[in-house]
Amino acid sequence: MKMKMILPMMLIAALPLGADAQNKSGLVMSNLDKTVKPADSFYQFATGGWQKNNPLPAAYSRYGSFDQLSENNNKRINTILSELQKKTYKAGTIEQKLSDFYKLSMDVDSRNKAGIAPVKPLMDEIEAAKTKDELQKLQVKYAWMGLGLSYGAGFAADEKNVTMNIYNLMQGGLTLGAKDYYLNNDAATVAIREAYKTYLSKMFQLYGFSADEAAKKASAVFLHETTLATFSKSRTELRDPQANYNKMTLAEFKENYPNIPLEALANAEGIKSEYLKEMIVGQPAFFAGYDKVAAAECASTLKALMEWDIICSSASYLSDEIREARFEFFGKTMSGRKEDYPLWKRATAQVDAQLGEALGSIYCKRYFPESSKKMMEALVKNLQISLGQRIDAQTWMSDATKKAAHNKLDKFYVKIGYPNKWTDFSKLSIDPSKSYYENVMACRKFANDKEIAEKAGKPVDKDEWFMTPQTVNAYYNPTTNEICFPAGILQYPFFDPKADAAFNYGAIGVVIGHEMTHGFDDQGRQYDASGNLKDWWTAEDAKGFNKRADMYADFFSNIKVLPDLNANGRFTLGENLADHGGLMVSYNAFKNATAKKPLKNKDGFTPDQRFFLAYAGVWGQNITDKEIRNRVKNDPHSLGKWRVDGALPHIDAWYEAFGVKQGDKLFIPKNQRLELW
């Protein structure tokens, strides 16, 4: 594709990747499947060898290069934790907390001996309550745990006044996540629903109830969740930021939902009423429905719901029998996994989940060189310049909207590698004399108290990170207009300092472009340069954007991911726009960066071909059919295959690079190719 270079080349940052001419291609030839024409399935051509050489491990429902990198990261983290075991540390130090928590997570024998003992006092206290009033008093007593409450709550930026935090309420209460699992009647969904009923009953029995008692409690929970599903918003509907922003005063909330004792619960949790004067109620219709359900439900149902919440929050931290029962449903039935992860991996993941930033500080000192951060900073600068050029190239946009888009782009807050300041864990106590479950709950209570202390009535801290440094991922946050690239993702196959620009722009470059494009996707475009939910588009430009976005939604909705199942292009719209935009922006940046010193062919491929092969290589994976069904309902990203074979056929440069022509399976006529950014 011919690009117009709007900005002078001297503004492109010099990327410190060494002498590109001498750098390797970064490609692994055994990952390819050259028996397939690139134009018939580029995904298979670029990743078929990888798929063959990396069969799906029994513990995974999906295993791809993302997961492979995560596994390598887990080994690094496990090495850190194993080394910590070799010494004794003073109580209260971060090393003591990490070391003792890891020991607890590895101590299966103690958990198997204890059974449900760690949760039995709380379960008994709830079971002993005779009336609804007594149960509601227990809800207040344990308010921070949210027992029997079918909604989520917490402090976050006020999307129309993003310098301040505000109390947010959102729908919840569905153990299976998506409402579709409760309401759809296709054979696969019905089978999961029936298995869920069995699972509910089994878990109540494992927590000490008779078969008859368990059946009654399971029925109450299932009926409650099914009722909630009827007035819950779909995953797609939850993607509309304007529709999910509804500001209310506390007085209005009480009037609208008299059967939800929000103030009493919040006060008991440590939130003063003055911080509830205004709040955001994400889904008013859901809360109206839930208010009626809460009023009508009897004591026995509320009791079952409270007990079910305890079961859900503890099942992974008690005996193997209980953990395995949970895995049988969520791992095998829902996702198609054949076995659970080994103990060391589960333990490492839990330390990472509960004490991630403490671990991240050690991880970055050991595994993230400053040189990688500098290389990323240069890449990000080049991608920002390129996105500015892509904005200017959009002939359907007015100058006024382009100017506002540039303002937003210029104000991106970039985070790379690790936070500027680390979480203070001094108030968290990890007590090896207590159970694993009790220590997990101590971590959760610490995080909950920390959020209240730092956010209730307080300004937004733009330096807060929403991922740990060792996470293999990246994100864009609209309310701070930030793009974040943790140290964990800055490794092969996303980033290789010894590879040339074709590889790095095709891999990590597209990731950077992807996150930047999120600032201008169907959701992100509704937030201004400061992060406020505020319209900055002319009416005509907004219409033009929506017309183009609708075409993406329709295209991906027509993709069959299984013989009886289509993708949901409306649900995955933001991610599909970011994939396509990321490719366009990074390809343009790649051409900018190599204009004066074009790269040579390597390993039998041109520079442009290597760019697209690097991108596709990121998405190689093997996946079960059950996991495909699960992701179509719950994951806003397209499947790996379609992030390649769905995105690339809309990019002219890919056609030119691989000689794709009419008659090839992936060919789309030029006038039908989609473009937005």
Regions found by a protein language model. Give the residues of each.
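Bacterial Sec-dependent N-terminal signal peptides
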Residues: 1-22
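Short, Gly/Pro- and small/polar-rich lid/capping loops
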Residues: 22-30
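Noncatalytic, helix-rich "gating/capping" subdomain that lines the substrate-entry/channel surface
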Residues: 84-378, 382
